[in-house]
Each structure stands twice: as structure tokens, then as C-alpha cells.
Amino acid sequence: VAFPTETVYGLGADAGNPDALAKLYSVKGRPTDHPVIVHLADAAQLGEWAREITPVAQKLARKFWPGPLTLILKRAPRVGDAVTGGQDTVGIRIPSHAIAHALLEKFGGGVAAPSANRFGRVSATTAAHVRQEFGDGVDLVLDGGASDVGIESTIVDATGAAPVLLRPGHISAREIEEAAGAPLALPTAHSPRAPGTLAAHYAPATPLLVMESDLLRELAATLTRQG
């Protein structure tokens, strides 16, 4: 099921169902070692999916949830490797979009929901984008209009004493530091892997050329002559 959030459209599956997760990875063409984010309706469900909730995590959750923030936390025992990519951490988000909230509240559990696009492609921000990307490959698309934010959620590693910004997004680094009451720490080689942080990601279908202005004028003139 594809559904709208305030950031981008998500492609959702039961985060506790290995078969549903396998189908999710297959439809997206996503590597199975690339973690997905678990979406919840309410912070009261957090203890089912994460453990050792740090003071930093509590402060950020109070400030930005529901909203476009994903927190990386230590995973609870029930959370499988298919969600975390084999890591000891899990990404959790509580979206603010009314349709997403209604869906999550009705479902009553965690929904694993990466962006509703094929792996490596640009994220969908409308229901039409989802249909264009997947055709009939998605069972149901909930149309909530265009996403308000239009980029994916900010991801913060909140497993330690200081927040670590793993993926920039709508929430700025300064806002994170102010809410956490601590300066951002730099990611290290041991930081958790996070969705949307590979070297090649969000690639448009249209080719992009980078060139000097003189060469650009020559190319434009050539294309004009060719019609």
C-alpha cells in the first residue's frame, strides 16, 4: 500500500511480517541489507520497537513528533533483520499527515515504509508519481494530494549522548541542536547505516550534463540546427 506523508509518499508493509517485508523489498528492487523506517501512530508504541530510549531521543521526539524526523534507536528484540538490515538499531518515525496517521492508527502496529519509488530513483510526492513508477505493481495507492515537505525525513542517530545527523532533511541542524540541548556529533565509520545515504541515490531519469558555459552554448546551437 502506498500512502501520503508530509515528506514524500511511502510504500508500506507490516513491519512484523517477514513475507510482507520480502515483497516490499522485491517491489522496490531494494537491497535487503538497506534498512527501512518503521512508522508508528503514537509514541506510546515506541517501547515495542526500540529500547534504551536516550534523553536525547526523548527531547527530539517531544519537539518534532509527529513530524518529518526519523530517530535511530536501539532495536527491541521483536524487530527482525529484514527491517534493520542486520543492524542493532532501528529507524522510527511518527508522521504528521492526517491520512498516514489514520492508516497507522487503524492498523495498530508498525508499518515499514520506505519512499514509494524504485530503489535509487527520485521519491514520489504525489499519487500520480507512484502510479507512474509502479503501475499495477502496488495494490493500493491512497491519494492525499502533493506532499507538503517534498523531501524525505531528517534522520538522527539518537543512540548516544549527542545527536548525530545521518541524513539532512526539512529539520535543520540548528533546530536539532537546540531541541537536544547538545551539539551535533559527526558520523563515524561505526555510525548506523541509514536509508537514503548511499553515494548513488535519488537519481532522475533525465540525463544531466555539467559543462562550461561556452560548451553549453555550442551544444545548444548544435541541437537547434538538428531540430
For each predicted feature, which ranges?
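Active-site-adjacent structural elements in enzyme catalytic cores
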Residues: V1-G227
